[in-house]
């Protein structure tokens, strides 16, 4: 799973996920399913934000990479991926500037057009169950919730999906592709139900005895097929800016 994550996701996404896990004392090399889940969630947050701007009239517009957008303001502020101290600093700044209510939990994004924080969810289960879990945890009508699944389903607060259909379809397609790539490598079942996978692995190890004449070393080389996986497609200009901003914050 670790090799898959490093080949499948943008290097900046992988780096931010590693830093987030280490901040909580978790090891990406051991908790590989969580590593994959965090990378997926980060990618969805970035894709949610990509190419969405606010023009001088305060209207939301979509500008593709390469178009002049120096005078445009990004519609979404990305909070997810920052260390906790910096993330709360950003949240406090937004609240002081806009007057919105401060959330009890760190949200993932802030929407400058709708003036609300957004909690993004990516689930391997049914969307309505995960939505209710998020809502019960947050317990705030001020934070907008938007849940995506790997099967193409989604659910949002008051059925307000924020983004246009094409932007949401791009996210759904990416999630479905991740699922298909995992399944083709036999990783999907353990990703969906990691506890059962661990129990089955322990059971298999107890039943198996070492066989004479069989190789005992495991190859860690990346297969040629895995090397062909393209990383996440992202606005290259914003990727560079985000990398500089996020990593600068991490060093402080």
Swiss-Prot record:
Q: Which UniProt keywords apply?
A: Decay of host mRNAs by virus, Eukaryotic host gene expression shutoff by virus, Host cytoplasm, Host gene expression shutoff by virus, Host mRNA suppression by virus, Host nucleus, Host-virus interaction
Q: Where is this site: Important for efficient shutoff activity and nuclear localization?
A: 195, 198-199
* Matching Pfam families: Flu_PA
Q: Which residues form the active site?
A: 80, 108
Q: Biological process GO terms, please?
A: viral RNA genome replication; viral translational frameshifting
Q: What is its main location?
A: host cell
Site positions per UniProt: Important for efficient shutoff activity: 202-203, 206
A GO MF annotation of the entry reads: RNA binding
The cellular location(s) given in this protein's UniProt record come to: Host cytoplasm; Host nucleus
Q: Which InterPro entries match?
A: PA/PA-X, PA/PA-X_sf
Into which family does the record put it?
Answer: Belongs to the influenza viruses PA-X family.
Give the comment on domains: The probable endonuclease active site in the N-terminus and the basic amino acid cluster in the C-terminus are important for the shutoff activity. The C-terminus acts as a nuclear localization signal. The C-terminus is recruited to host protein complexes involved in nuclear Pol II RNA processing.
Q: What is this protein's function?
A: Plays a major role in the shutoff of the host protein expression by cleaving mRNAs probably via an endonuclease activity. This host shutoff allows the virus to escape from the host antiviral response. Hijacks host RNA splicing machinery to selectively target host RNAs containing introns for destruction. This may explain the preferential degradation of RNAs that have undergone co- or post-transcriptional processing.
Q: What is this protein called?
A: Protein PA-X
């Amino acid at each position: 799973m670790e090799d898959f994550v490093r080949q499948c996701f943008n290097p900046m996404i992988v780096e931010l996920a590693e830093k987030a896990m280490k901040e909580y004392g978790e090891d990406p090399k051991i908790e590989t399913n969580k590593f994959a889940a965090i990378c997926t969630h980060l990618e969805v947050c970035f894709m949610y934000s990509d190419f969405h701007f606010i023009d001088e009239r305060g209207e939301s517009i979509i500008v593709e990479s390469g178009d002049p957008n120096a005078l445009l303001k990004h519609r979404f502020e990305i909070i997810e991926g920052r260390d906790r101290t910096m993330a709360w600093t950003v949240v406090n700044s937004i609240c002081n500037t806009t007057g919105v209510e401060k959330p009890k939990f760190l949200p993932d994004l802030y929407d400058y057009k709708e003036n609300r924080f957004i909690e993004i969810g990516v689930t391997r289960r049914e969307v309505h169950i995960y939505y209710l879990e998020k809502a019960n945890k947050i317990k705030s009508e001020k934070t907008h919730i938007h849940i995506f699944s790997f099967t193409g389903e989604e659910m949002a607060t008051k059925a307000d999906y924020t983004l246009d259909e094409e932007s949401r379809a791009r996210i759904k397609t990416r999630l479905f592709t991740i699922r298909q790539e995992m399944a083709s490598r036999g990783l999907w079942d353990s990703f969906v139900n990691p506890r059962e996978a661990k129990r089955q692995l322990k059971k298999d190890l107890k039943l198996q005895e070492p066989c004479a004449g069989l190789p005992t070393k495991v190859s860690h080389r990346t297969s040629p097929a895995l090397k062909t996986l393209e990383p996440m497609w992202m606005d290259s200009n914003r990727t560079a800016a985000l990398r500089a901003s996020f990593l600068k914050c991490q060093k402080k």
